[in-house]
Regions:
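Short, small-residue-enriched loops and turns at beta-alpha junctions
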Residues: 69-71, 97-100, 124-127, 153-154
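A cross-family glycoside hydrolase active-site/sugar-binding cleft signature
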Residues: 64-65, 92-96, 118-122, 147-149
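Active-site cofactor/substrate anionic-group-binding motifs, chiefly glycine-
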Residues: 52-99
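Residues at alpha-helix caps and immediate loop-helix transition turns in enzyme cores, especially N-
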Residues: 76, 104, 129-133
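Short, compositionally biased "basic patch" segments
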Residues: 19-24, 45-55, 72-77, 81-82, ...
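N-terminal active-site wall of soluble small-molecule enzyme domains
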Residues: 79, 102-110
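Alpha/beta enzyme core
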Residues: 81-86, 110-117, 124-154
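An N-cap/entry alpha-helix motif that binds or orients negatively charged groups
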Residues: 1-53, 57
Length: 154
């Protein structure tokens, strides 16, 4: 396992530890909303389906980029991909850098053959490796689009 994979596994483990969980809560329990229903609109007549990247999706929601390129990330991505497929919503992958550098299989299409999938690379890696890396990222997961994330600390 490489340093990148170890670091990404460490990120997941740190996020799961109790000492990194909020003790104060989110304070959403302090909020109350005034109900302003739409009695003239029946829920069964409401359709939030739309198109994204020219593809039909069930709702204007997307599973955001979470993790990638590490052992613990694969199971997380499997569950997210299965949810994207089941709910007919897009999924953005976490950074593909480690998987591409290590030649690891990226199985997202096995779990979400019909979902709209967005690959993901860092701008720094793209600047260093060029357009070929972007093409490999898209082709390796049969992505419908590619997200370029910015990390100013790199």
């Amino acid at each position: 396992m490489t340093n990148i994979s170890n670091r990404k596994d460490d990120h997941i483990q740190l996020a799961l530890e109790a000492r990194h969980q909020s003790q104060s809560g989110s304070h959403f329990d302090r909020l109350t909303f005034e109900h302003s229903g739409l009695p003239e609109q029946a829920l069964e007549d409401t359709d939030i389906a739309c198109h994204f990247l020219g593809r039909p999706i069930a709702a204007p929601f997307m599973i955001g980029a979470m993790t990638g390129g590490c052992n613990n990330g694969e199971l997380i991505n499997q569950h997210l991909a299965e949810a994207a497929e089941y709910c007919h919503i897009p999924m953005a992958l976490g950074s593909q850098r480690a998987a591409l550098e290590q030649g690891l299989a990226q199985n997202v299409r096995r779990w979400a053959p019909n979902a709209t999938i967005l690959g993901n690379l860092g701008a720094t890696q793209l600047q260093q490796s060029g357009l070929d890396l972007a093409k490999r990222a898209v082709e390796s997961v049969d992505a419908n689009a590619l997200i370029i994330h910015l990390n100013p600390l790199q």
